[in-house]
């Protein structure tokens, strides 16, 4: 999906958020955001930690979990719960999209479908509601897993 914001603008917002919350600026917070931004995919806390440890051997998984909680609370990242691969994280500064998640291998596919979006808007309008957000996840067995089970 197309990114809506540059890494530098996200990091600038992060610095302002850290200051607003009365916290000290931390290179590790910026590094977690950078890893997620550059990956362009959904990463586990372990994958994020492994990536950061390439530069900083002292990074702990517990620090990464604390940082992820802060980033999620401040809407810098989105969390995706999957049954196979646990919590996965992605940068929030992307165009709206939905997810297809394979229950067997944990593969995640992002997609955007204008027809689905239009239909959701029609449903909201029918009930005279105001759509704030939505998150669609479809749990499937991907093509590869179906073929390997035959």
Swiss-Prot record:
GO CC, alphabetical: cytosol
Residue numbers spanned by region Dimerization: 94-150
Subcellular location: Cytoplasm
UniProt KW Cytoplasm keyword: yes
Entry coiled-coil feature ranges: none
Protein family according to the UniProt entry: Belongs to the Fur family.
Protein residues bound to Zn(2+): 42, 90, 99, 102, 105, 110
Biological process terms in GO annotation: negative regulation of DNA-templated transcription; negative regulation of siderophore biosynthetic process
Keyword match Iron: yes
Gene that encodes it: fur
Subunit structure of this chain's protein: Homodimer.
Protein name: Ferric uptake regulation protein
Binding site for Fe cation: 96, 98, 117, 134
SUPFAM superfamilies xrefs: Winged helix' DNA-binding domain
GO molecular function (one): transcription cis-regulatory region binding
Organism of derivation: Helicobacter pylori (strain ATCC 700392 / 26695)
InterPro entries: FUR, Fur_C, WH-like_DNA-bd_sf, WH_DNA-bd_sf
Alphabetical list of Gene3D superfamilies matching this protein: 3.30.1490.190, Winged helix-like DNA-binding domain superfamily/Winged helix DNA-binding domain
Matches recorded under Pfam families: FUR
């Amino acid at each position: 999906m197309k990114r809506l914001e540059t890494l530098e603008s996200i990091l600038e917002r992060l610095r302002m958020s850290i200051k607003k919350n009365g916290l000290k600026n931390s290179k590790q917070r910026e590094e977690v955001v950078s890893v997620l931004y550059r990956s362009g995919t959904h990463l586990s806390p372990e994958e994020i930690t492994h990536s950061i440890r390439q530069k900083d051997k002292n990074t702990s998984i517990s620090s990464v979990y604390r940082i992820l909680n802060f980033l999620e609370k401040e809407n810098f990242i989105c969390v995706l719960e999957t049954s196979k691969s646990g919590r996965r994280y992605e940068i929030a500064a992307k165009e709206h999209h939905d997810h297809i998640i394979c229950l067997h291998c944990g593969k995640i596919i992002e997609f955007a479908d204008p027809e689905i979006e239009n239909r959701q808007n029609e449903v909201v309008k029918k009930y005279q509601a105001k759509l704030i957000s939505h998150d669609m996840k479809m749990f499937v067995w991907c093509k590869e897993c179906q073929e390997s089970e035959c």
